[in-house]
Swiss-Prot record:
Annotated GO MF terms: 16S rRNA (adenine(1518)-N(6)/adenine(1519)-N(6))-dimethyltransferase activity; RNA binding; rRNA (adenine-N6,N6-)-dimethyltransferase activity
Binding positions for S-adenosyl-L-methionine per the UniProt entry: N27, L29, G54, E75, D100, N125
This protein's UniProt keywords: Cytoplasm, Methyltransferase, RNA-binding, rRNA processing, S-adenosyl-L-methionine, Transferase
Keyword Magnesium: no
Enzymatic class: transferase
GO CC terms in record: cytosol
Protein name: Ribosomal RNA small subunit methyltransferase A
EC number from the UniProt entry: 2.1.1.182
NCBIfam families reported in the protein's UniProt record: ksgA
InterPro entries named among the record's database cross-references: KsgA/Erm (IPR001737), rRNA_Ade_diMease-like_C (IPR023165), rRNA_Ade_Mease_Trfase_CS (IPR020596), rRNA_Ade_methylase_Trfase_N (IPR020598), rRNA_adenine_dimethylase (IPR011530), SAM-dependent_MTases_sf (IPR029063)
GO BP terms: rRNA methylation
Phylogenetic placement of the source organism: Bacteria, Bacillati, Bacillota, Bacilli, Lactobacillales
Described function: Specifically dimethylates two adjacent adenosines (A1518 and A1519) in the loop of a conserved hairpin near the 3'-end of 16S rRNA in the 30S particle. May play a critical role in biogenesis of 30S subunits.
């Protein structure tokens, strides 16, 4: 029997008198086939350390611990710590850290792996309400995670992996794809969770690029420009950028020159631009002193 078997999950929750907290976005997966697929997608073996976020009662942790060198699971809900000590008692390669992943000194914790030099993968069922902040926090942390295989709301996975000229494409697609390749591995129906969420989920596989997707003079400025370009999706690049930089004649003049230099029409929309085109635009705007 597995922790994720519905009868086991139910028994564990009843034994510990656990009640779900909506504020933590708790939805426990009760499908062993899907858990197996997640671990297979992440290509976990004994030469990999794993960071898990939100282990719940240990359903995914169990599958990870069977294959990984070590698993470090960050759980914000202190009520789950004794439950995890119970469900994972047979594993000596799991460490549960009762901390908020957004506030913890992750670089310090990683040094506690027996072999901190092994590749580190992030495998997690992320809380829906805080998926994007957690992902961006980890991606921008400077810690060289080799790969992320994470479950999230399908709509968010679609946005992260979206290509130009699609409805889902936006500043989040650019922010992630600058650092990583991103592809939806498979869909997870809402019916396999306790309690069932209101939407379907997706497993997103993201692999770190050896170098960022495009070379830019100023990364922060590049992200600001891409974000500004999507402020109002139906508006043109010109309208969004004048809304961001200002509408003085001086700004308009610089903007005209930068767009010309980047080979872009003022009437194009942000959703039509590739990462390379955003890079060219950001560098041209920077060159004009904007």
């Amino acid at each position: 029997m597995r922790i994720a078997d519905y009868s086991v999950t139910k028994a564990v929750l009843e034994r510990h008198g656990f009640t779900f907290k909506k504020s933590f976005g708790q939805n426990f997966l009760t499908d062993t086939n899907i858990l197996q697929k997640i671990v297979d997608t992440a290509e976990i073996d004994d030469q990999v350390n794993v960071i898990e976020i939100g282990p719940g009662i240990g359903a995914l942790t169990e599958f990870l611990a069977e294959r990984a060198a070590q698993v470090m699971a960050f759980e914000i809900d202190h009520r789950l710590v004794p439950i995890l000590a119970d469900t994972l008692r047979d594993f000596d390669n799991v460490t549960v850290v009762n901390e908020d992943i957004l506030k913890v000194d992750l670089a310090q914790h990683i040094q506690n792996f027996k072999n901190p030099n092994l590749p580190i993968k992030v495998v997690a069922n992320l809380p829906y309400y805080i998926t994007t902040p957690i992902l961006m926090h980890l991606i921008e942390s400077g810690i060289p995670f080799s790969e992320f295989v994470v479950m999230m709301q399908k709509e968010v996975a679609d946005r992260i992996s979206a290509q130009p000229n699609t409805k889902a494409y936006g500043s989040l697609s650019i922010a992630v794809q600058y650092y990583m390749t991103a592809k939806v591995a498979f869909i997870v129906p809402r019916t396999v969770f306790v309690p069932a969420p209101n939407v379907d989920s997706a497993i997103l596989k993201m692999v770190r690029r050896p170098e960022p997707a495009v070379a830019v003079e100023d990364e922060n400025f590049f992200f600001k420009v891409s974000k500004a370009s999507f402020t109002h999706r139906r508006k043109t690049l010109w309208n969004n950028l004048t809304g961001y930089f200002g509408k003085t004649e001086e700004v308009k003049d610089k903007l005209t020159k930068a767009l010309d230099q980047a080979g872009l029409s003022p009437s194009v929309r942000g959703e039509a631009l590739s990462l390379a085109e955003f890079a060219g635009l950001a560098d041209a705007l920077k060159g004009q002193g904007l």
